[in-house]
Amino acid sequence: MRFVFIIALLLIGASLAHPADPIRAKRDVSASEDEFSGDSSGEISGESSGEASGEASGEASGEASGEASGESSGETSGESSGDEETSGEGSGEEGSGDTSPVVPVDELTLQQLETLNTYAQQVQAESQKLIHQANFVITEMTALSANAQNLGILSNIVLANSQMVLDSARLSLNETETETGTSAPATCVSSAVCYGDSGCGSGKCIGALAGTCNCNSCVFGWPCQEDSACGGFNGACNSITATCDCFAAYTKNNLTLAEALTSFCNVETCNGAEDNVEKCHGLPCNYGFCVC
């Protein structure tokens, strides 16, 4: 309390000591106003400068940080894309290394393509020809098979007829032997049972013990010393091989093989022994025909 009382007395004394000095009071008031304005202007200028500097620094820092972050992100993305391109190129090179190289189409000229096309058409035409030829061969084979079947049927008929003729000839031979009492037939009967050449007339008895008559007078490859062993065929006995060569005899007597088979052997007519040399070239005359 004492301290407060002392302060109050000092204030009262000060106010009473200078009441008549208005200039000084005005000076004091203006000084206080100046201090107040200085303080306020300082505070305002400080605040404005602080805000301006803060905004400038904020914008600068923002732009700097934005540019830095943009550049860093751009560089990072560029590097990553570069890495991806590098990896893509690497994978592409590795992948292409695994497969065979592909020749670009533009390396082939138009002339080469036309040549290949022409060659392909030729191959196709040749294949069509081969197909037609194969079809023709198949058709011919079918026709030959049918003809062979027909020939088989005809051969069976001929065999049956020949068997009938053979049986009739054997029967007539047996009757002749019974009537004449001789076993030597005047003529040769093909495939007749024989025990020697005498039982085959002009033919030969082929086979051991009971053989069969071979009425072919000239037997190819039959051993001989002269033409008489070859059925009397002129020039049939080959002196070098000592065997009968009937085909050479045809040539020596001016006959081709076709002529001998179609117009001479068993076709040329004869009357007997007197015709053997002229018409039958030494071969026997059997049943009125020259027998080869």
From Swiss-Prot:
**Can you tell which superkingdom this protein's organism belongs to?**
Eukaryota
Name the InterPro entries for this protein. Answer: Cpg-3 (IPR039260)
Respond yes or no to whether keyword Glycoprotein is given for this record.
Answer: yes
Organism in which the protein naturally occurs? Caenorhabditis elegans
Its signal peptide is: 1-17
Compositional bias, Acidic residues, is annotated for 81-96
This protein is called Chondroitin proteoglycan 3
The annotated regions of Low complexity compositional bias extend over 38-80
Sorted keywords for this record are: Glycoprotein, Proteoglycan, Signal
What are the boundaries of the region Disordered? 28-103
Glycosylated position list: 174, 254
